[in-house]
């Protein structure tokens, strides 16, 4: 086994990927997980390249005054590496990362950067994918004795232990143990977990219940790939167990009915691929379709389907976008004024009440690229909306949502956005919510050619958004912008920009 080297360095700043940046004695840049600016740390090098290295903190020699104890000390680097800083420091770093991205591309933002956060920093995730880990009982006992490690029960992540056996079954079994796990950042190993503090408590409870059920059946991790658990805002859960062998009875119907979930599936996933892709659905239990209401509009989605992970913050982004629909070319006051911030809305009933009072212009055409299941276009787009999405499963869910909403003027288009350019006519408001890679060059070229009056651009990567805006600003100006902390305790940022055609 190749030995990983240790280095002691000083950390200077947080960079776009979310790591802290330092410099090794040989001049190479070192991108470090688990450190904060101003700290001196000992790091373990996990990846080496000619001009840079990647590392994780092994020891903090001189801690930052901003450092706090992570909620999940053993696994936070796997899921949420910014658990080591207070929320106000996290918000400041995210503002700086947005500013750095636009400065890099010579784009001047017209107002101070504001990042909306509802201050719910844990328990917000409605979807978690767990890996699995097994080792022999003897090896586990020896390693725990050497390290002094004790088994941590379910109460670490939730006070609710209903339906969970708080006594480990592993000691009474021969053979392999079975544990939930996440991949350890910076290595090929795994870290055993009882859940994650980012998740809704119902997700952790269900994951542990499935683990305990499989322990009783003496299932080993080598037979399994992953466990996907998802819940709606009420805490009702569905699950998918991805297996490497065709084992349709690994969980029976009676056993599935005993779990704290409304439904679940056993999925055979080709073991030749590390990804949890659906090769064959082996067994189905109960109702596996979830329903959530977004700004008063109900949406149905599958366990494996695309849907927002943090719905309350997403609703705020939608409220902000709605203020820029429709576009009135004769008004100097279409949309909000720079520097004005909408009231923070936390109660979903209040959101629905406010939203239902906003008149929609049914004759204002809307084109929604990278539409997912249609949560943007179908909530803020009024009647005349075209939704373009590349994923066939998402389009099927979108079509079902359109039918159930009786949205007769909405059209779902299955196509990559770069192959649906004829829908850009220059008359519609264009909404884009692309993946991290940003807009396809052909989409940008067509926008500049057809010149729609307004572009609403929501991005999960400010760096590629800034790159795209730099190209579009030859014909467009930034009317408004705002950031959103969809994923607290992680480096991920969402940023909304409203682009209006120059006079």
Put a short name on every predicted segment.
Residues 112-114, 222-232, 366-368:
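A short glycine-rich, hydrophobically flanked beta-strand micro-motif that places a catalytic Asp/Glu
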Residues 189-225, 231-232, 245-260, 265-266, ...:
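Internal alpha/beta scaffold segment
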Residues 137-176, 328-363:
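Intrinsic disorder/low-complexity segments
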Residues 2-10, 16, 216, 245-503:
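Rossmann-like S-adenosyl-L-methionine
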Residues 58-71, 76-138, 176-220:
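Extended interfacial segments that mediate partner engagement and assembly in macromolecular machines
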């Amino acid at each position: 086994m190749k030995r990983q080297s240790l280095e002691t360095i000083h950390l200077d700043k947080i960079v776009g990927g979310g790591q802290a940046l330092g410099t090794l004695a040989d001049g190479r840049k070192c991108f470090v997980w688990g450190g904060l600016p101003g700290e001196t740390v000992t790091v373990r090098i996990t990846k080496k390249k000619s001009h840079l290295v990647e590392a994780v903190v092994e020891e903090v020699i001189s801690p930052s005054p901003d450092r706090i104890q992570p909620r999940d000390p053993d696994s936070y680097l796997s899921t949420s590496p910014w658990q080591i800083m207070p929320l106000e420091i996290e918000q400041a770093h995210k503002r700086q990362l947005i500013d750095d991205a636009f400065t890099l591309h010579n784009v001047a933002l017209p107002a101070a950067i504001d990042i909306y956060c509802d201050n719910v920093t844990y328990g917000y995730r409605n979807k978690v994918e767990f890996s699995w880990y097994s080792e022999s009982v003897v090896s586990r006992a020896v390693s725990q004795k050497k390290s002094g490690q004790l088994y941590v029960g379910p109460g670490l992540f939730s006070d609710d232990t209903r339906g969970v056996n708080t006594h480990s079954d592993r000691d009474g079994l021969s053979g392999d143990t079975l544990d939930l796990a996440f991949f350890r950042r910076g290595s090929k190993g795994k870290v055993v977990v009882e859940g994650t503090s980012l998740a809704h408590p119902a997700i952790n409870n269900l994951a542990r219940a499935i683990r305990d059920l499989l322990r009783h059946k003496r299932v080993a991790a080598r037979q399994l790939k992953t466990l996907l658990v998802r819940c709606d805002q009420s805490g009702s859960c569905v699950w998918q167990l991805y297996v490497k062998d065709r084992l349709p009875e690994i969980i029976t119907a009676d056993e599935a009915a005993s779990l704290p979930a409304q439904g679940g599936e056993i999925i055979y996933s080709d073991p030749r691929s590390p990804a949890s892709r659906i090769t064959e659905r082996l067994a189905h239990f109960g109702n596996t379709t979830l329903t959530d209401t977004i700004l008063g509009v109900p949406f149905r989605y599958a366990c494996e389907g695309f849907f927002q992970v943090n719905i309350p913050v997403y609703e705020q982004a939608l409220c902000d976008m709605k203020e820029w629909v429709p576009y009135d070319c004769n008004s100097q006051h279409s949309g909000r004024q720079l520097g004005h911030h909408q009231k923070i809305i936390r109660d979903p009933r209040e959101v629905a009440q406010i939203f239902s009072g906003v008149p929609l212009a049914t004759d204002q055409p809307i084109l929604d690229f990278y539409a997912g299941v249609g949560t943007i276009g179908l909530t803020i787009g009024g009647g005349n909306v075209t939704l373009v999405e590349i994923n066939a499963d998402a389009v099927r869910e979108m079509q079902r949502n359109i039918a159930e909403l009786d949205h007769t003027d909405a059209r779902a288009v299955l196509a990559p956005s770069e192959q649906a350019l004829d829908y850009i006519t220059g008359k519609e408001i264009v909404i884009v919510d692309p993946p991290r890679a940003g807009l396809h060059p052909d989409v940008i070229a067509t926008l500049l050619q057809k010149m729609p009056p307004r572009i609403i651009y929501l991005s999960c990567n400010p760096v590629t958004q800034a790159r795209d805006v730099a190209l579009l600003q030859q014909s467009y100006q930034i009317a408004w912008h705002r950031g959103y902390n969809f994923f607290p305790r992680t480096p991920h940022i969402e940023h909304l920009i409203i682009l209006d055609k120059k006079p």
